[in-house]
Curated annotation (Swiss-Prot):
The gene is lipA. InterPro entries: Aldolase_TIM, Elp3/MiaA/NifB-like_rSAM, LIAS_N, Lipoyl_synth, rSAM. This is Lipoyl synthase. Pathway: Protein modification; protein lipoylation via endogenous pathway; protein N(6)-(lipoyl)lysine from octanoyl-[acyl-carrier-protein]: step 2/2. It is an enzyme of class 2 (transferase). Belongs to the radical SAM superfamily. Lipoyl synthase family. The lineage of its organism: Bacteria, Pseudomonadati, Pseudomonadota, Alphaproteobacteria, Rickettsiales. It comes from Wolbachia sp. subsp. Drosophila simulans (strain wRi). PROSITE patterns: RADICAL_SAM (PS51918). It is found in: Cytoplasm. It catalyses: [[Fe-S] cluster scaffold protein carrying a second [4Fe-4S](2+) cluster] + N(6)-octanoyl-L-lysyl-[protein] + 2 oxidized [2Fe-2S]-[ferredoxin] + 2 S-adenosyl-L-methionine + 4 H(+) = [[Fe-S] cluster scaffold protein] + N(6)-[(R)-dihydrolipoyl]-L-lysyl-[protein] + 4 Fe(3+) + 2 hydrogen sulfide + 2 5'-deoxyadenosine + 2 L-methionine + 2 reduced [2Fe-2S]-[ferredoxin]. Its cofactor is [4Fe-4S] cluster. One of its GO terms (molecular function) is 4 iron, 4 sulfur cluster binding. [4Fe-4S] cluster 2 binds at C60, C64, C67.
Length: 287
């Protein structure tokens, strides 16, 4: 595995606020993608009381080659999860929350109803908190993402992850054009919802392929794109091709804005929910 360049070295997670956030998460039996996916930004985000909550358990039914989340046979759904989540958000005094999940291909609706219950429960307890969701593709789960769109999260995020050529290797159980269809339909069903998608680089894609993904996302009327460096979690995961330089990320940002995205986050440490509250405020200012 390649040694990390200086620009990818994040501070170790420490501090009083970090520990308070950790304690609240554990107290309410919540999982976070920050921990499960070993996010490099956990120290910075948790010290700001920003955490991305992962619902539907901590075990995924897929095994994408880039992802560090555990795979296998998941536990049954926790019926108290939506209420526990809402209570934790109130205790953390979050102005903006990001909710994601593992894939649950074992469930008839892929877990869509749990997303909806979380949205409803949060709005019962704290109506001022804006809600961003990051969902799986709900492949072959008819009506699943459509129902979530009707529930009106403030932001609907679904990550395209990589270029079409690399799907068979990186996301073997996903379909590129289905993900585009999901994003396009969410916007058609509920035009008030901001749509967002993310892309990893450093997996062997070309610049031309990245520009084509940008065009495809704009054709689906996606408002916001995130572009970040792929970091290989373990030697068993998809091999890192190279580290993309900060200057290249700036170039991608320039190109993405020129193609019509309302907001672009593009840097080595950019992740789907990194600076999500600040970026949501930027989105609102564009409308």
């Amino acid at each position: 595995m390649h040694s990390k360049p200086q620009w990818l070295r994040a501070k170790a997670p420490t501090g009083e606020v970090f520990n308070e956030t950790l304690n609240i998460v554990k107290l309410h039996n919540l999982h976070t993608v920050c921990e499960e996916a070993a996010c490099p930004n956990i120290g910075e985000c948790w010290n700001k009381r920003h955490a991305t909550v992962m619902i539907l358990g901590s075990v995924c039914t897929r095994a994408c080659a880039f992802c560090n989340v555990a795979t296998g046979i998941p536990d049954k759904l926790d019926p108290h999860e939506p209420e526990n989540l809402a209570k934790a958000i109130k205790k953390l005094n979050l102005k903006h929350v990001v909710i994601t999940s593992v894939d649950r291909d074992d469930l008839p609706d892929g877990g869509a109803n749990q997303f909806i219950q979380c949205i409803e429960e949060i709005r019962k307890i704290t109506s001022e908190t804006t809600i961003e969701i990051l969902t799986p593709d709900f492949l072959n789960k008819k009506g699943a993402f459509e129902a979530i769109a009707v529930a009106s999260p403030d932001v609907y995020n679904h990550n395209i992850e990589t270029v079409p050529r690399l799907y068979a290797k990186i996301r073997p159980r996903a379909r590129y054009f289905h993900s585009l269809y999901l994003l396009k339909m969410v916007k058609q069903i509920n035009p008030k919802v901001f749509t967002k998608s993310g892309l990893m680089v450093g997996l062997g894609e070309t610049k031309e392929e990245i520009f084509q993904v940008m065009d495809d996302l704009r054709s689906a009327e996606v408002d916001f794109i995130t572009i970040g460096q792929y970091l290989q979690p373990t030697p068993k995961h998809a091999k890192l091709d190279r580290y993309v330089t900060p200057e290249e990320f700036e170039h991608y940002k320039y190109i993405a804005y020129s193609k019509g995205f309302l907001v672009v986050a593009s840097s080595p440490l950019t992740r789907s929910s990194y600076h999500a509250e600040e970026d949501f405020n930027r989105l609102k200012a564009c409308r």
